[in-house]
Amino acid sequence: MLRVIELNFTDLEYAGFRAWPASDQREFDGFVLRSSNGFTKRANSANAIRPLISDLKGLVNRCEEYFFDQSLPSIFRIPSFIESESLDEYLEENFYEAKDHSLVLHRKIEASDFTPCKLAVKNATDWIASYSEISGINATSQKLHLDML
């Protein structure tokens, strides 16, 4: 029997946060602030999770202070499901630029879409070695990545 699970966009955001953890994660005023020593933008950004109704100047200043204290650039990640026109305008007026737009594709997956396969289960150290080999990077430079896993 096929089971349908209803998820809202905020639940999906939190699932994404759990899938790619950050060293530090805090919430306030509709944002999830995440940092991991600059390893990826997703794990080092202010992520809007609900419509923002508070003072934008104060909110952006608090986010900027958070990243400044960690010697990181301020990156705001604003999913398309967030009503953010005023935040977008405020950030643009303060010299932020929109970069690296994401596109999420989805489709219904039928049970017959899957073929049996074997999965290799690896510990984090072995996974980093495989990732580094595939990516053509030095595995010894991946300590932060390993710490996140």
Task: Give, region by region, the residue ranges found by the protein language model.
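Short amphipathic alpha-helix that is part of the acyltransferase structural core
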Residues: 1-14, 48, 102, 109-148
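A broadly tuned preference for mixed-charge, low-complexity surface segments
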Residues: 21-29, 84-87, 123-135
